[in-house]
Regions:
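FAD-binding core of FAD-dependent oxidoreductases
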Residues: 54-68, 72-76, 83-108, 136-158, ...
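FAD-binding glycine-rich core of flavoenzymes that anchor FAD
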Residues: 111-138
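C-terminal auxiliary extensions adjacent to catalytic cores
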Residues: 2-23, 27-34, 38-41, 46-49, ...
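Generic short alpha-helical segment signal, independent of protein family or function
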Residues: 65-68, 81-89, 101, 105-108, ...
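Cysteine-centered functional microenvironments
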Residues: 135-140, 317, 321
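Generic N-terminal targeting/processing segments that precede catalytic cores or assembly contacts
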Residues: 7-99, 118, 125, 209, ...
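Alpha/propeptide regions of enzymes that mature by internal proteolysis
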Residues: 91, 111-116, 217, 306
Length: 493
């Protein structure tokens, strides 16, 4: 299947399909016409332009008052890409780099950036052939666009930098020769069009949202298993209470739990306790708030990826070139910080349920092992979960509240959205690990609950339990736990 880039709305769901199904991507007629029209207009303006145009006939940042001669405009753009490729730190994971390529091509396709058709096409050639530029996590302030990471993304276009191809990192020029591609001679404004933009932040956000939806679903499944294993009550999930406080996420979570628990024998057993701890009783409110946060951030990010986010903006029909600030990452930096907080809470409440399951309450043995003392059982997985959620709390300090002036004060307020983006990914990875540890504990506890109660949970929960037991066994005596935690993580991926 091939996805055609057009001016139609590109959704998170569609992006997920493109990435997971390894679909090819092509420019549609609408996009081609818009790109060529804008480039033709910009070329014509270069012939008789009577005033300086930022980034087109001038230097960049605080060098905006330096006028560049017409015969050096191409060199200006070439120099920009080379000089701005200053990233450091770990490399960006390949899935996110693929998204960066696609989102950059999408943004340039609206015909307000001035890119050549061959430039946009080459971005898609890299995407379609899984030739991924080596991009580094550190270097962007999330304001003048994601300058450093997008420079690394763009280096291969001019035959420089490195790419990941068929599992190996190689000089892009080598791969270009194999593909029969020539380095592109960037024209006026093109380097700036490539580097100005929020595609580093947006790609991280898109990848994160895909994972957030998956983990939110797993949190409900695992939470329901923990509820059954802990001999929890069903009343907090009944619809009447949630009609009094109709947050969509809360209602959706309660409804989901009632579906997961439908037909359970365990949930109908007589309960001596009147109510459950908050980590069980308030699952609809907490998991629901996370769902609402995901939904809100998704709406913001979808708006962002369907936008032109470089500078200046070119308007051929209006005969205008406007220098403005669509590259500023604040609109997505704040939501990404908020999403990190939401996912951290999903891990926080999960860790509390882990703690309850190993505490020797409601008939369950201490640390979920038949002979505690000789065996430590599930004592230390909770330590691991506690360590992870503690780290998340530090990672959730908002990046977007910080700003450091740059470029001799010309760029005096920045979003730090790139830091929000990379921190968000770490929080999500951590959340996945905590949920996997909860599943590890919940399945062990459910085995004991089966023995204690003599009956079973619902078909849905028992199905998950049965599938999980095919990869992670019941633990009778102490064993090497790390591989089992890793298998648990892989199970929910």
């Amino acid at each position: 299947m091939t996805h055609i880039i057009s001016h139609e709305h590109l959704s998170l769901g569609r992006l997920k399909e493109i990435i997971e199904n390894h679909e090819k991507v092509e420019l549609g007629p609408e996009a081609v016409a818009a790109i060529e029209k804008c480039r033709k207009y910009l070329d014509s303006k270069m012939e008789d332009i009577g005033r300086p145009v930022y980034g087109v006939t001038t230097g960049f940042g605080s060098l905006c008052n330096v006028t560049i001669p017409a015969d050096q405009l191409s060199q200006l753009q070439h120099n920009l890409v080379m000089s701005h490729a200053c990233g450091t730190g770990e490399t960006v994971r390949p899935q996110i780099v693929r998204l960066m390529l696609l989102l950059k091509a999408q943004s340039l396709s609206y015909g307000h950036s001035g890119a050549q058709l061959i430039t946009v096409q080459r971005l898609l050639d890299m995407f379609n052939n899984d030739i991924l530029p080596v991009v580094y996590q550190q270097g962007s302030l999330g304001a003048s666009g994601d300058l450093a990471p997008l420079a690394h993304l763009s280096l291969p276009l001019i035959g420089l930098g490195e790419v990941l191809y068929k599992g190996k990192v190689r000089p892009s020029k080598e791969v270009w020769d194999e593909m029969g591609w020539e380095p592109i001679s960037l024209q006026s404004k093109e380097g700036l069009a490539l580097l100005n933009g929020t595609q580093f932040m947006s790609a991280h956000a898109i990848w994160s949202l895909i994972q957030c939806h998956r983990l939110s679903e797993w949190a409900d499944r695992i939470g329901a298993m923990s509820l059954e294993a802990y001999d929890g009550r069903v009343e907090p999930f009944l619809p009447l209470t949630h009609q009094l406080r109709p947050h969509k996420g809360q209602i959706d979570t309660a409804t989901r739990f009632m579906t997961l628990l439908d037909g359970s024998e365990l949930i109908r057993n007589h309960k001596e306790h009147v109510q459950d701890p908050y980590s069980f009783r308030c699952i609809p409110q907490v998991h629901g708030a996370v769902k609402d946060s995901i939904r809100y951030v998704e709406s913001v990010i979808e708006n962002e990826i369907n936008s032109a986010t470089d500078n200046p903006n070119v308007f051929p029909d209006e005969d205008m070139i406007i220098s403005a600030g669509n590259f500023h990452g604040e609109p997505i930096a704040i939501p990404m910080d908020a999403l990190a907080i939401a996912m951290s809470e999903l891990a926080n409440i999960s860790e509390r349920r882990i703690y309850r399951l190993i505490s020797g309450q409601r008939g369950l043995p201490k640390f979920l092992v038949a002979t505690p003392g000789l065996n430590s059982g599930f004592m230390i997985p909770q330590y691991t979960a506690a360590s992870i959620v503690s780290q998340n709390k530090g990672l959730c300090w908002p990046a977007s509240v910080d700003s450091i002036p740059s470029s001799q004060g010309q760029e005096d307020h920045v979003s730090m959205g790139s830091n929000a983006a990379t921190k968000l990914v770490r929080v999500i990875d951590n959340c996945e690990e905590v949920l996997a540890i909860e599943l590890f504990n919940a399945a062990q506890a459910l085995d004991f609950r089966h023995q204690i109660a003599g009956n079973k949970s619902s078909e849905a929960i028992e199905g998950i339990f049965s599938d999980y037991r095919k990869v992670v066994p019941f633990i009778s005596d102490d064993v090497y736990m790390h591989p089992l935690i890793q298998k648990s993580i892989e199970f929910i991926r």
